Regions:
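Flexible loop/hinge segments that line or gate small-molecule binding clefts
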Residues: 85-123, 238-246
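Helix C-cap/helix->beta junction micro-motif
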Residues: 42, 97-98, 172, 225-228
Length: 246
């Protein structure tokens, strides 16, 4: 009986989670809550967890955080991976130390983990494009909104969603122009000004999508400007996102 054996064992297990830095109420808040609930539920197994963070817009931050984890030699690691080349440097050293690891949120197939918990991001983006065009119909222009810093969008998941989205558009709506608006990840106070400029330049664009969990940035802007004729698709049931649906 594995359960009885674990209860009888005096071994203590330490796991480390590596997550993107985030504000209270954002997507990763719920993930953290789930981690702590799991540890509480399985406290009989003498498990503990430590959560480390990295800046999702800075690859070197991920590298530094991974170095700190390796120095602690935990029994297992759960991570939200960054770009494959930086993730692989970390996972190679975990494997060399016989430390198992799992991915959450986004998967890297050529750097396979023990397990992955999340969606198929490309299929999600592909399906989102289909939904978008059910709304856009014969419209000739749509827009992708991003939060970006120095060319980095912040997660593999967002990149793969966009790849799937563009694949569908290329296959089924090749004549539709895909516009882009990159909002500064580090300068939120400029969002409304940049959105104002975009809609002055493209007043006829009525459909857009964001592949991150911050659809509320555009949604709240649309509400503040009284724009009720714009269709916006986003991800994740954050409270501020849900409020924009009401």
């Amino acid at each position: 009986n594995m359960y009885a054996s674990a209860l009888a064992s005096n071994k203590k297990y330490t796991f480390i989670c590596l997550l993107p830095q985030h504000l209270e109420g954002e997507y990763w808040t719920a993930v953290e809550l789930g981690i702590h609930e799991a540890i509480a539920t399985y406290s009989d197994f003498n498990t503990s967890v430590k959560i480390n963070y990295y800046d999702p817009y800075d690859y070197h931050s991920f590298v530094n955080a991974s170095e700190a984890i390796l120095a602690l030699q935990p029994d297992g690691v759960m991570m939200a991976p960054t770009a494959p080349q930086y993730t692989k440097g970390f996972t190679d050293r975990l494997q060399a130390s016989d430390i198992p690891y799992i991915y959450i949120d986004s998967n890297i197939k050529n750097v396979p983990p023990l397990a992955f918990f999340g969606q198929n991001s490309r299929q999600s983006g592909y399906f989102a494009a289909r939904m978008m065009m059910l709304l856009a119909r014969e419209e000739k222009e749509i827009v992708i909104f991003r939060k970006i810093h120095e060319g980095i969008v912040g997660s593999n998941q967002q990149e793969n969603r966009e790849i799937g989205f563009r694949q569908y558009m290329k296959e089924h709506h090749p004549s539709c122009t895909i516009l882009e608006l990159d909002l500064h990840a580090e300068r939120n106070d400029e969002d409304n000004e940049m959105l104002d400029e975009f809609f002055r330049t493209y007043p006829m664009v009525k459909n857009g999508i964001t592949f991150n969990s911050k659809a509320y940035i555009v949604g709240e802007y649309l509400q503040s400007r009284g724009k009720k004729d714009f269709n916006l698709i986003g991800y994740d049931l954050l409270e501020r996102n849900v409020t924009c649906l009401k």
